[in-house]
Amino acid sequence: MQLFANSCYNKVDFKINENKSAQDAVTQFSAFNIGCLAVTDESNKVVGVCSERDYINKVAAFGKHNTQAKVKDICTYGPKIIVAHPEDSLDVCMRKMLFRDIRHLIIMTPENNECVGMLSIRDLIKATMKDKNETIARLSDFKLGKGGFFGSE
């Protein structure tokens, strides 16, 4: 399933360099109405994630000014990052988010570990609603004798 094809992150720059200021991250959050950024190193490799929660927990909570803090000071690095793969199902992505109580998943290709997108909990809710509405429509059509079930077209 190409879940991330309809993601709100497909149309925006969702990456930020780890040496940028926390203020730059907040500016991107606000400009694109998103809540998470993939953090990259100098070679543009994804090394972490920076979310609104990271900002609140690490900048605002410690009284730092966001012009002083760098993205690398507040982001989540390494093995703590939970990722999805392009072929992951809606259910798999939802379980990953619920297991770690997170609201965003970076989409990484398993072959070369390349970041190809990002999913938000909002994207998963929209996909779930679409699936449920399609199921309801099919069942309603079946009940009414429509939809080609058992040659009743």
Predicted regions and their residues:
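Histidine- and aromatic-rich ligand-binding microenvironments
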Residues: D54-Y55, D73, S89, D123-L124
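Short hydrophobic beta-strand motif reused across regulatory alpha/beta modules
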Residues: G48-S51, R103, V116-I125
